[in-house]
Amino acid sequence: QSDGALIQCMVGQQPGTEIRYNWLHDTIKYGARFDGNGAGNNGLMHHNVIWNVQGGIMVKGFEHNLFNNTSFDNGDKNDIIVMIDQGGNDGTITRNNAANKISGHRSGSYQDYPVPGIYDHNWNGYETNQNIKDFLMDPENYDFRPHPESELIDAGTNIAGVTDGFIGSAPDQGAYEYGGEMWVPGISWDLVEVFGEDFSEPEPMYDGSLFH
């Protein structure tokens, strides 16, 4: 397969879709993508951390929302790609993100390919000439919170329904709030607590060639 993403939404799936609170990492494909012919619109991605993929976030279409994502170390493609072509991303809002490479092109710089739509309150390594990992607590050990001296702190802007409950004078840039919850993606509840001692996991079905 020559194309793909860990989370892939085609045109008809994008309106009203919300991709949030994920760690996406370690693949030769994209992290999360609104894909297709450019007719997709009104998708939302927020509070995702993406690293060690081949292109972090890619968005085609228009009137999407990209808020409070953190992305770095994603090969020779950019960390957040808001495509200038294939829909043009008119009306797309890119805000409160923190990434080493945010651009309107798969691999070209922000200076050569400015992000289309509305672009503000982002930390972009193309603009700062710094590494976003230097402003995170311990990214090598999966602690992506801003460290106490990080310039990400209070550098964002409030977004209703996304940054509610922020700490300080303004929301932080990126997927984590300094002093806020150290969230970890995935199921954290206990099966026994929810279903009781009688719960048993279903046995896999094997038909001689495939597990179902």
Mark where each language-model region is.
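Hydrophobic side chains in beta-strands
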Residues: 9, 22-24, 34, 50, ...
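C-terminal accessory segments
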Residues: 125-197, 202
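A structural detector for beta-sheet-dominated domains
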Residues: 10, 83-85, 147
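Boundary/junction segments of secreted and surface-exposed precursor proteins
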Residues: 209-212
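Beta-propeller domains
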Residues: 1-44, 52-56
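Flexible loop/turn segments at secondary-structure boundaries
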Residues: 1, 14-16, 27-28, 40-41, ...
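Predominantly extracellular beta-rich ligand-binding scaffolds that present long acidic/polar faces
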Residues: 36-143
